Regions:
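Sequence context of c-type cytochrome heme-c attachment sites
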Residues: 27-135, 151-162
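Short, exposed beta-strand-loop hairpins at the edges of beta-sheets
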Residues: 144-151
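Bacterial N-terminal signal peptides
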Residues: 11-23
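Classical N-terminal targeting signals for secretion and organelle import
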Residues: 2, 22-25
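A contiguous, mid-protein "functional segment" used to position or interact
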Residues: 136-143
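N-terminal secretory signal peptides that target proteins for export/translocation
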Residues: 1-8
């Protein structure tokens, strides 16, 4: 007996086999069904006062918007938007920085740049609702090798001053 299977049919059968092996899907908590929004560094202060004080006192990124303002006259609108990606909190993402007037609490690179949107964590205080232990890879979104060379700085995992 000869069987003829199209590649699509084989792929579909493989996918169904994998899904069957995984079993029924678990219910997703309501919180997991929506995207967390940015709440700003000041929302971290009530529970993380020591880290907040250290960050706002010593971390250069806590006042990173000043760098944009210093260079603003020399930059195009598109270049400024590119700066927003690393020098503000959550630019281009739900609840992230829009502009200095509408979202002043997000105008610098705050806690959530590294730790992710804090909406759920601020409500629950559950450590699973925020990125806690950071790695150097977490820094590489902004601290690329090109920027390290251009600005002569390197990512420091504890460079957030906490």
């Amino acid at each position: 007996m000869v069987y003829s299977h199209s590649p699509l049919k084989v792929a579909l059968m493989a996918l169904l086999s994998i899904l069957f092996a995984l079993g029924p899907a678990r219910p997703v908590p309501a919180q997991d069904q929506k995207i967390a929004r940015y709440v700003g560094t000041s929302a971290c202060k009530p529970c993380h006062e020591k880290e907040f004080k250290a960050f706002t006192s010593f971390a250069k990124k806590s006042s990173s918007f000043q760098s944009i303002n210093r260079l603003r006259k020399e930059l195009t609108a598109e270049e400024i938007k590119a700066c927003y990606l690393c020098h503000t909190t959550g630019y281009g993402k739900p609840g992230g920085f829009i502009n200095e007037q509408l979202t002043p609490d997000l105008k610098n690179a705050g806690c959530e740049v590294c730790h992710g949107p804090g909406e759920f964590h601020a409500k629950t205080q559950d450590p699973r609702d925020i990125r806690g232990d950071l790695t150097e890879e977490d820094c590489e979104a902004c601290h690329t090798s090109e920027r390290v060379k251009a600005f002569r700085y390197k990512p420091l995992i504890r460079g957030g001053a906490h």
